[in-house]
Amino acid sequence: MAIAGLVHGHADGFFSHSLGRRDVRIAGIAEPDRALFDRYANKFKLDPSLYHADLEELLRTVRPQAVLVYTSTYDHRRVVELCARYSIPVMMEKPLATTYEDAQAMARAARAAKIQVLVNYETSWYPSNRAAYELLHSGAIGELRKVVVHDGHEGPQEIGVQPEFLGWLTDPKLNGGGALFYFGCYGADLMTYLMDGQRPLTATAVTQRIKPDLYPRVDDEATIVLTYPKAQAILQASWNWPFSRKDMEVYGRTGSVVTVGNSDISVRLPHETQATTRAAAAIQKPYNDPLTYLRAVVLEGAKADALSSLETNLIVTEILDAARRSADSGQTIRLAD
């Protein structure tokens, strides 16, 4: 596989967890900033011959089986359209795009080239989220009524992200917004998953800039309310939490399930007076790890999972785009009839 870009901070975690694996091999890294590549090369002892300044030159000469994307969100469209030209599948860090227009363009390119375009969310690999889905769809808590999702941390500057990462996270063009896009996407993805791909009727969003001295150009606080014929979602995305969090509350007509970290759930079933906490079942391979999953999809024809699929993430981008317009206008945006 090849790497496109190194400006996304998650690239560091990728190298930390992948370099010792035998089932994947890095065939090339495309990054226009040679100093940035050298920093990673020194830290992870990467072969300098992996370096390419230009992605198309890498694709043409190396012909990787897949491309992992660690660019800004804005650059996802360029990467996907380029990879589609060479019929190479892509997995990118969430979210899919900064605009619904870009998301649709990527979908057209992917479908024309018959390539997979997958979106990697940390929460896709949480057994707790899978367990919440299974419990809901088993009928144990009744028909879905309300979902509340909390995502974020103290703020990218406060937690000390890399300077190249902070640079585009706080750029409204390159990130699509601030916390609204970067953390709102998690809840939009999970709600679309829980709803089996149903689009919401409306999106209403409120954003704030609580720390304008740190984030003068983008929001650092966002709440999105989505409505469905018989359900509602409240997505709370923030760079103002006192700690890092990615958790979800799912309320059915007769019971509830709350995710506790990435591996436990707190469940209250009908006629119970209090919730009980239990361990979520482990996720079965190949859907338990992003690289195992990517390899299975590319080489073995495994089905794209709903959380990372292009179809789900088109809806996620439609939601985020509508939420941004709602926050800007102060109006509720209608998505579906």
Segment roles from a protein language model:
Residues 66-68, 296-337:
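C-terminal helix-rich "cap/oligomerization" subdomain common to oxidoreductases
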Residues 105-123, 143-145:
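Rossmann-fold dehydrogenase core element
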Residues 182, 188-264, 291-303:
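Contiguous beta-strand/loop segments that form the cofactor/metal-binding neighborhood of enzyme cores
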Residues 124-206, 210-214, 330:
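Predominantly a Rossmann-like dinucleotide-binding segment in NAD(P)-dependent oxidoreductases
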Residues 3, 92, 117-119, 259:
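Hydrophobic residues in well-ordered beta-strands that form the structural core
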Residues 44-109:
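Beta-loop-alpha module in the N-terminal Rossmann-like domain of NAD(P)-dependent dehydrogenases
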Residues 1-45:
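N-terminal Rossmann-like dinucleotide-binding module
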